[in-house]
Amino acid sequence: MTIQTVTDAICYVGVDDNTLALFENQYSVQPMGVSYNSYVILDEKIAVMDSVDARAAEEWLSNVAQVLEGRNPDYLVVTHMEPDHSGSLMRLAQKYPEMKIVGNAKTFTLIKQFFGTGAWSEDRMLEVGERDTLSLGLHRLRFLLAPMVHWPEVMTAYEETEKILFSADAFGRFGSLERTARAPWVPQARRYYYNIIGKYGAQVQALLKKISALEIKTICPLHGPVLTEGLEECLRLYDLWSQWEPEESESILIAHASIHGNTAHAAKTLKGKLEKKGVQVNICDLTVTDLSYAVASAFYCGKLVLASATYDGGLFPPMREFLEHLRTKGFRNRRVGLIEDGSWAPAAARLMRTKLEEMKDIHLYETVVSLRGTLNQTSEAQMDALVAELCAE
């Protein structure tokens, strides 16, 4: 990744990873890749803002050295200790033995857990707390703790002179900078938010409250592009997302899990009926779609229809996994319709209802479409009744 200038005194020294298949070993990041972001503030004193994943250490160290032009960094500021951001921390600390490590109390607890108690001497650790400042010369960092956005040690750093928020994982996005330079921020930021941070909406709200009084001209996250335009919209969406509110309250996601295609056919039939009535419909095949896309779409829409086959007397596994992801990420405040399929003993609707009862403020439509293999006159009538309910609000 080419070194980029954020401002005259601040450089981007992060690294693109276009070979990683699964982010956190579960979310697809192909073909768009992912970036591990790091920044250098050049002043009377020099601060490196976070490190990168160990798999990108060599390129990152080269980028940092190129920007330093023979100078030594005074500080490594650690806003987040997850290994994709701390994986190269020790490499930089060993290369520059006079450099101090800046973090909060929980940062240093995790450093000792990850790297051992003898990683470096105590006098190299500079502990900061809420609203503490670190002067670099013309630039000054003010630290705002952001616990559980999405790890307990997370903090942000606000550079007061140039009005830059170093936001840790908040406002991040999937996609390497090289491959997604012209891509809109929102789709992959939404997918990133709901799958990585989404469970912690209350904590995101607390962070948004802290930064609401700040004048922010630039946001520098740990994944995705540096944000300089449309910041008001980014903040608005984070406020909406962290309250688990839909972006499109009248749009519908139909998520289906079909074994031999009959349940999928019913889902597509429902989609056609709804579209004839002018409804915006997204449809997702849970047997082939990366679940992170399905989760993001479920939160985007105001209504959800679940269509699942019965399998071994239980839910077909792709639907069961989808519902577990939704529960884990705090899915709530939605209206949900159910379609079940079972050739001799359909049980999917009852089992989906049980899963949904574990979530907050989920309201089920009265009509359940129940198939015995394929749509027939009875189930078609049920589907028409469900369409009427979905369109009544």
Model-found features: residue ranges?
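FMN-binding flavodoxin-like domain, especially the glycine-rich phosphate-binding loop
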Residues: 177-219, 223-226, 269-284, 294-393
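Active-site metal-binding motif and surrounding structural segment of the metallo-beta-lactamase
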Residues: 44, 55-102
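Short acidic active-site motifs
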Residues: 88, 289-294
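Metallo-beta-lactamase
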Residues: 4-8, 102-154, 200-208
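Conserved beta-strand hairpin/beta-sheet module of binuclear metal-dependent hydrolase folds
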Residues: 3-66, 156-159, 163-167, 263
